[in-house]
Amino acid sequence: MASLSATTTVRVQPSSSSLHKLSQGNGRCSSIVCLDWGKSSFPTLRTSRRRSFISAAKKETIDKVCDIVKEKLALGADVVVTADSEFSKLGADSLDTVEIVMNLEEEFGINVDEDKAQDISTIQQAADVIESLLEKKA
C-alpha cells in the first residue's frame, strides 16, 4: 500500500494595523503572543494585551509628555526620559501614574477613558493615546 505525506508551510505577515512593539528597547517583550490550535484545524493568534497601536505620536507630543512626567516626578536634569521610559522605572507608583494622566488631560484638553488610562505605562503609550484623542477631537 502506498503512503502519502505532505508538508504545509504557513507564513503569517501581520498587517500594519495589527503590528505592535514587542521590545521596549531593553530586550524584553512587552506583550506575549500565543499560538493556539484549539479545537479547530487552523491556529488562532492571541496577544496578552486587549489593544495595541502603532507608534504615530509626533516628536513634539513625546517631548511635552516627557517634560510633564519629569516635572510631576520631580526628576533631576541628569535623568534621561525617552519615549521608551516606563513610569514605574522612573519611580512612579499607581497614584503618580493617575496624576500624570490627569496632568496630560489638562495640558492637552482631552479626556482619557479609564480603560485606556490603565494601559498607559510608558511615555510612548501616553503620547499615542494623546495623538489618537486629538485626531478624534479635530
UniProtKB/Swiss-Prot annotation:
Question: Under the GO molecular function aspect, what terms does this record hold?
Answer: acyl carrier activity; phosphopantetheine binding
Where in the numbering of this chain does the Carrier domain appear? 59-134
Quote the PTM field. 4'-phosphopantetheine is transferred from CoA to a specific serine of apo-ACP by acpS. This modification is essential for activity because fatty acids are bound in thioester linkage to the sulfhydryl of the prosthetic group.
Instruction: Give the family per the record.
Output: Belongs to the acyl carrier protein (ACP) family.
Q: Which gene is the coding source of this polypeptide chain?
A: ACL1.1
Q: Which UniProt keywords apply?
A: Chloroplast, Fatty acid biosynthesis, Fatty acid metabolism, Lipid biosynthesis, Lipid metabolism, Phosphopantetheine, Phosphoprotein, Plastid, Transit peptide
GO CC aspect terms: chloroplast
The chain residues annotated with the modification O-(pantetheine 4'-phosphoryl)serine are S94
User: Pathway it belongs to?
Assistant: Lipid metabolism; fatty acid biosynthesis
Lipid biosynthesis is among the record's keywords: yes
Primary residence = plastid
Plastid as UniProt keyword: yes
SMART domains attached here?
PKS_PP
Q: What taxonomic ancestry is recorded?
A: Eukaryota, Viridiplantae, Streptophyta, Embryophyta, Tracheophyta
Entry protein name:
Acyl carrier protein 1, chloroplastic
- SUPFAM superfamilies listed in its UniProt record: ACP-like
The transit peptide region is found at: 1-56
Q: Which domain of life is it from?
A: Eukaryota
What does the function comment of this entry state? Answer: Carrier of the growing fatty acid chain in fatty acid biosynthesis.
Report the record's disulfide bonds. none
